[in-house]
A protein has these predicted regions:
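Core helices of alpha-solenoid repeat scaffolds
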Residues: 4-5, 36, 66, 97, ...
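Amphipathic alpha-helical segments within extended alpha-helical solenoids and repeat-rich scaffolds
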Residues: 259-261
Length: 360
């Protein structure tokens, strides 16, 4: 009886690149651990299609390939390191923790990026210290994967991430803030509030607002309301209030939505600049937030917002979150509205909450 795996392994050495590619693909389908070492050797193939097929095959084989791929992280050929680390980013386990930590110092940013991602998968607290310096890596993709890895590690990384909030380099602070948001840890709230009001860099403060929204702790509500007064932070703070979902924010959000009735908003003029754009964004975010919180007190304001172009779509989406509760006020608006365009959108919103068009 023919040994299909052995046949395909032999075909990896064929002179025809198409045959080598097909063999690698077939070995990925068969998922036999015997193919790991031959496939790793093919990572050095001159043809990219063959290398890619071998990479996919190793990924398909999975766990049996982990330790062999870990050894590839010190291969003298950088391409082999890149391909091996890319697979480990998805299948790594604790057996390759040490080679991955060493790979964080690779001169190749692709290897550093994949190594950081792989360590996030392993989630070993011992990798926090070697990961933290990569928050200031010159390559954005490396910084982002490091931030995600530290967030995945969670509690063990919190002290290092909180300490990084006072780093002299703004990029380190920025990615530390992002990581803390991803952890969704209540312990990060007070440090992030300090960043929100004290950091000298606007981008860092903006990310602090986003992170507080991700965490969703109600302690941040009153501080986010205060942050709404700062130009540039207003739309972000409104969005964060919606994500937190605390009803204390509802009156503030309704007040924001009332801004759509101002003449300079409902009938914009040329030359209003960035502030006008920010006001438009804030109005939409307020409608979205009210829909997320779903306090029925907000329904009249959202119904009224249907009449204005700048808020119509977001208000309609928000109203649908309330379900059948909004049918009566929408029908009342429909009865007194003469504008055909507005009437169309009212009917569309009614249909989305289950009101049949034939009954309108």
């Amino acid at each position: 009886m023919a040994d299909t795996v052995a046949e395909q392994i032999a075909a990896l050495k064929d002179e025809d690149w198409a045959i080598r590619e097909e063999a690698a693909t077939m070995l990925g389908t068969l998922r036999d651990p015997r193919a790991v070492v031959p496939l790793v050797f093919v990572l050095r193939d001159d043809d990219r299609a063959v290398r890619d097929a071998a990479t996919s095959a190793l990924l398909a084989i999975g766990e049996p390939a982990v330790t062999t791929l870990g050894a590839c992280l010190s291969d003298p050929v950088l391409t082999v390191q890149e391909l091996a680390s890319s697979v480990l980013a998805t299948i790594a386990d604790a057996r390759v923790r040490e080679p991955l930590v060493k790979a964080l110092a690779s001169p190749d940013w692709i290897v550093r990026m994949h190594a950081a991602k792989a360590l996030g998968r392993i989630q070993d607290p011992r990798t926090v210290a070697p990961l933290v310096p990569l928050l200031q890596d010159k390559v954005k993709a490396v910084r982002e994967e490091t931030s995600s890895a530290l967030a995945a590690i969670g509690g063990a990384a919190l002290p290092s991430l909180i300490a990084a909030l006072t780093h002299t380099e703004w990029l380190v602070r920025l990615h530390a803030v992002e990581a803390l948001g991803k952890t969704r840890s209540a312990e990060a709230v007070n440090p992030l509030l300090s960043v929100l009001f004290n950091d000298r860099d606007r981008a860092v403060r903006e990310d602090a607002v986003r992170a507080l929204g991700q965490i969703g702790d109600a302690r941040a509500v009153e501080f986010l309301v205060t942050a709404m007064k700062e130009p540039g932070l207003r739309p972000l703070a409104i969005e964060a209030l919606g994500r937190i979902g605390d009803r204390r924010a509802v009156p503030v959000l309704i007040e924001v939505l009332k801004g759509v009735e101002r003449p300079e908003v409902s009938q914009p003029i040329d030359g209003c600049g960035d502030q006008w754009d920010e006001d438009m964004i804030a109005l939409g975010e307020a409608a979205k937030a009210l829909g997320t919180i779903r306090d029925e007190v907000a329904i009249p304001s959202l119904v009224k917002a249907l009449r204005f172009t700048v808020t119509r779509a977001d208000a309609a989406d928000a109203l649908t979150r309330f379900g059948g509760t909004v049918i009566t006020p929408l029908l009342a608006l429909l009865a007194r509205e003469s504008d055909d365009n507005i009437r169309y959108h009212i009917k569309e919103t009614l249909a989305r909450v289950g009101w049949r068009a034939g009954r309108v």
